């Protein structure tokens, strides 16, 4: 009798997890590409990125991730220049947010954002993209405002 209750509880938990997974957009569904950073300080760096293409992917972003590998990130791209605003809700790792102009020029970097913060982080100018990297990665790569990002989206 007790074994049956344990099995029933386990089955219920599995079904609950499966049902919840339907509502979470898996990150592997996002397009993955490589972009090139041209830094004045350290030259070129290749970065593997996931590119958000829909409002749902942008809303999900890097939420609930517990690790961000070096030289990888997520690129939030918008077709028209705007003051991009971001936050760290449900994001467990510190990030560097690199705001990029239409021509691929790095406009501004917000380094070491605070995990789980709902403070709004602004590009503070007309930009078309935000590249999120692991916290400290922009400094390790020597990335600064004025450096260039090379990817077909910025052509």
Over which residues does each language-model region extend?
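Compact, glycine-rich, soluble single-domain proteins
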Residues: 28-155
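N-terminal twin-arginine translocation
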Residues: 6, 21-24
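Bacterial N-terminal signal peptides
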Residues: 11-22
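Bacterial N-terminal signal peptides that target proteins for export
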Residues: 2-13
